[in-house]
Amino acid sequence: MAFQILLNVFLAFCWMFLSNSPSAAGFITGYILGMLSLFFFRRFFTRQFYLWKLISIIKLCFIFIKELYLANVSVMKSVLSPKLNIRPGIFAFKTELTKDWEITMLSLLITLTPGTLVMDISDDRTILYIHAMDIEDAEKAIFDIRESFEKAIQEVSR
């Protein structure tokens, strides 16, 4: 992926200087043309076209922002209500992620979401122990994490 991005930037600079338009518009035009040429010659690269991975990263960011907003609203409702009606709990989340950076990313996304905190990871790196501030159903929480964060991380890494 990094090689394709650097090659695309190199092609953009070549286009910008060969077309005698050293400006941001010339660079962007060269970048788009370079991206198209890399797309057409993608079968010569060992990895998939980098734009798909970039789209997956952007999708993961939007999922995190959405979950962050929803969790903030939920925590705000709990904190501002006159009667503190929460059900804190700890549940075990069995992850399908295998690489260390994937598990770290999942742990960070869960911890950065208000109301949840990854307390520990099992020695075999397959189970995350998560504390939730207000949890009604552990199975629903596991399903939500698996369908949002874990699925998006798998799209980025594979």
UniProtKB/Swiss-Prot annotation:
A cellular component annotation (GO) from this entry: plasma membrane
Localization annotation: Cell membrane
Gene Ontology molecular function terms on file: sodium:proton antiporter activity
A Pfam cross-reference name: MNHE
Superkingdom, natural source: Bacteria
Membrane-spanning residues: 21-41, 51-71
Residue pairs linked by disulfide bridges in the UniProt entry: none
Membrane topology: Multi-pass membrane protein
InterPro entries: Cation_antiport_E
One annotated GO biological process: sodium ion transmembrane transport
Family matches, as PANTHER family: NA(+)/H(+) ANTIPORTER SUBUNIT E1, NA(+)_H(+) ANTIPORTER SUBUNIT E1
Family: Belongs to the CPA3 antiporters (TC 2.A.63) subunit E family.
NCBIfam families xrefs: PRK08965.1-1, PRK12651.1-3
Record's function text: Mrp complex is a Na(+)/H(+) antiporter that is considered to be the major Na(+) excretion system in B.subtilis. Has a major role in Na(+) resistance and a minor role in Na(+)- and K(+)-dependent pH homeostasis as compared to TetB. MrpA may be the actual Na(+)/H(+) antiporter, although the six other Mrp proteins are all required for Na(+)/H(+) antiport activity and Na(+) resistance. MrpA is required for initiation of sporulation when external Na(+) concentration increases. Also transports Li(+) but not K(+), Ca(2+) or Mg(2+).
Subunit details: Forms a heterooligomeric complex that consists of seven subunits: MrpA, MrpB, MrpC, MrpD, MrpE, MrpF and MrpG.
Misc note: Mrp-dependent antiport apparently occurs by a secondary, proton motive force-dependent mechanism, but the similarity of several Mrp proteins to membrane-embedded subunits of energy-coupled NADH dehydrogenase complexes raises the possibility that there is a capacity for electron transport that could provide a primary energy coupling option for Mrp functions.
Protein name, per record: Na(+)/H(+) antiporter subunit E
